[in-house]
Amino acid sequence: MGRMHSAGKGISSSAIPYSRNAPAWFKLSSESVIEQIVKYARKGLTPSQIGVLLRDAHGVTQARVITGNKIMRILKSNGLAPEIPEDLYYLIKKAVSVRKHLERNRKDKDAKFRLILIESRIHRLARYYRTVAVLPPNWKYESATASALVN
């Protein structure tokens, strides 16, 4: 996928396996994979961290193929889904760190420009999540309260 605020074309990407069935060598049941997902979520891991851990430690290629549901759906059904989507959360975290950097380095014009780009990405993503009802319709990003959202 191409980059939003740079000249990168984004040609390379990983290929998801076509097979929609669990591999023949995979021995865990879907219930045990769901238990692992819930256990890792209770420890405080994000959905992408859970996916990486399942892939590396347990050999789960795709949780959706084995369980029939995506990791986020499993977390929502167990009441463990994060209140802010993960990609939006990390954009807000990045904006908070850039703003903190700008407090110490007021003349850093490049950081000011990058902060504008980050915050426009946040506004665009928040608008999308409001339309698909992941976020409440009155949710708004404010730089003053952003550090409270991240911590």
Swiss-Prot record:
Annotated GO MF terms: small ribosomal subunit rRNA binding; structural constituent of ribosome
In-chain residues carrying the UniProt-annotated modification Phosphoserine: S32
Biological process terms in GO annotation: cytoplasmic translation; maturation of SSU-rRNA from tricistronic rRNA transcript (SSU-rRNA, 5.8S rRNA, LSU-rRNA)
InterPro entries: Ribosomal_uS15, Ribosomal_uS15_arc_euk, Ribosomal_uS15_N, uS15_NS1_RNA-bd_sf
Location in chain, cross-link Glycyl lysine isopeptide (Lys-Gly) (interchain with G-Cter in ubiquitin): K39, K43
CDD domains with a match to the protein in the record: Ribosomal_S15p_S13e
Primary site of residence: cytoplasm
Protein name, as recorded: Small ribosomal subunit protein uS15
Source organism of this protein record: Saccharomyces cerevisiae (strain ATCC 204508 / S288c) (Baker's yeast)
